[in-house]
A protein has these predicted regions:
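Extracytoplasmic gate region of multi-pass secondary transporters
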Residues: 26-64, 71
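Helix-to-loop junctions at the C-terminal end of transmembrane segments
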Residues: 74-87, 171-172
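Structural signature of the two symmetry-related core transmembrane helices
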Residues: 89-104, 184
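Paired small-residue
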Residues: 101, 112-120
Length: 204
């Protein structure tokens, strides 16, 4: 009886350990996508005003108002889109949308073009960050929610911190347009990672 009881206790403990195991292989791609997203977004928040001034545009602050509208609007419809199309597919599509928006920001010649691109850029950024946070919490054991939130904020903060320094150096040597081209390239890396993850784990 004692032996049987000990075996059952060990079995329950093993099951609990399995439940609390974190599968970092499936989590690493959303974390990296968030990092690249923050890296690129730091280029926008830090340098789009200076970029607009260098092009002779007035009222560059309007960019951030339109950008914020895009971010807010994504919160209202992303949940329905994720349910309909799938988590990773929407992560992929928003990374692609952010790539197109940021690349075209590097091509603008008129202020209205910059304002037009602020909306999809804001939508993509506003969609990716909450998705990754929710994904991490859902995929980690309930007892590890603290790790999920810490990982989320670490990826975001590191992206912004590195971006602010790196983009400043690039701007000094290559100009503002190059910042946005390279920022867009970061999103292509995210797209490739999403495609690989979807294929390996057959995710939607």
């Amino acid at each position: 009886m004692l032996l049987g009881k000990d075996v059952s206790i060990v079995s329950i403990e093993n099951q609990n350990k399995e439940k609390e195991t974190i599968n970092w292989l499936i989590l690493i791609v959303p974390i990296l996508v968030l990092f690249f997203n923050s890296l690129t977004q730091s280029a926008i928040t830090s340098f789009v005003s200076l970029y607009a001034i260098s092009l002779g545009f007035a009222g560059a602050g309007m960019f951030f108002s339109v950008n914020a509208i895009g971010m807010i609007s994504s919160r209202f419809i992303m949940n329905r889109l994720v349910i309909h199309f799938g988590e990773f597919k929407m992560l992929l599509l928003n990374s692609l949308l952010f790539f197109i928006s940021v690349y075209l920001i590097g091509q603008v010649t008129r202020m209205y073009q910059l304002l037009f691109l602020a909306l999809p850029a804001g939508f993509a950024t506003g969609a990716v960050a909450p998705f990754v946070n929710t994904f991490l919490i859902k995929r980690m054991p309930e007892s590890k929610n603290g790790i999920a939130n810490a990982t989320y904020y670490a990826a975001m903060d590191i992206g912004y911190a590195i971006g602010s320094v790196v983009w400043g150096i690039i701007a000094a040597f290559s100009g503002y347009r190059m910042i946005f081209y390279l920022g867009a390239l970061m999103q292509i890396v995210g797209v490739i990672l999403c495609l690989a993850q979807m294929k390996i784990y057959r995710l939607k």
